[in-house]
Amino acid sequence: MSRYLRYTLLTLLWVAVAAYIVFAASAVRRVRRTGTVGKLEIEVVDSSSQGHLVSAAMVRQWISHAGIKTLGTAVDAVDLTGIERLIARNGFVDKTVAYVSYGGTLHIEISQRKPLVRLLTDGMNAYVTADGYVFAAPRASSLYVPVVTGSYRPPFPASYVGSVREHIDLRLGEIDERIAELEREKYPLYRREMENDRNISALRRMRIKRQWWRLEGSREFDARVDALREKKAGLRRTYRYRAGVIREEIERIAGLQEAERRKQKKLEKSYEDFMKLLTIVETVEDDDFWRSEVVQITAKTTPSGALEVELTPRSGRFAVLFGRLEDVERKFDKLLRFYRSGLSSIGWSEYRTIDIRYNDQVVCKK
């Protein structure tokens, strides 16, 4: 085949492809302009054996209550963006895609979030994902996940929906702005302090010279010296008082700033404890034995603000005092060894509490 013929065939092929694309685009525009939606299909793409947070029936109800028209509506008149926003505003929905197929079917694909745990603590009723995203437990939902109860206070309000890290960062930013605002309140005080220091320096330089050209006598000169001393003493007292007042106000503002920084540290610590709580839930869920054995996790906030955990096992009638969420794997290993070497021979109903909070020992109480 000659080079000329080959180029000609390639050109014709590309022309045909371009023509098909133009024709297809025109056909799609015609369908969108004249076609109507004849069918609505809703798919929750990641429903699992644990249950579901969102169902097709729920989505149909949302769309109906919002007044968004679907069936019988012209394809190009369907508010796809509105549908996606309507569904996505529910915190338990991760992603939503809505589109109309060539055949006139409105497809809605929904990906729900995968909660790790449900919080039922201190007025809280929310699901939390492994990466720390919080959302309210929806009505008519059915999903089995571990439940944490108790008096524990999470580092976010009960009505919060969203990333806990983002909430903490927002709070930290607000505190940073408050600290900066307090720092700006110091600026006029610093200027007053510098002015007062200059006055004190000027006061030290104040001297009296004998006025020889006026034939000033010793008595007159001594009188002027005494007057200057009295004036300097009065000014010195005034400047020292001002310096004390200014310094006291600066230290007061600095104290407020330090209090705000303590709030920041407390926020960061509470966030760390919260993520550790998720970690212990993951540890239980990832182990076949502990997933079956631990039936309840009770969390509480101590007077010092620390987080402590208590486990309710399936075996026996005792509670496991787990304590702070440090050395989690070591504590579980210690408890498992005690199960095997202690309780299996002593009996599962002998103790009321098993305390594993302390290093290298298990303390039991009847």
Residue ranges and their predicted role:
Residues 50-58:
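Short, composition-biased local secondary-structure segments
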Residues 1-46, 52, 63-366:
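Charged, solvent-exposed interaction patches on well-folded alpha/beta domains
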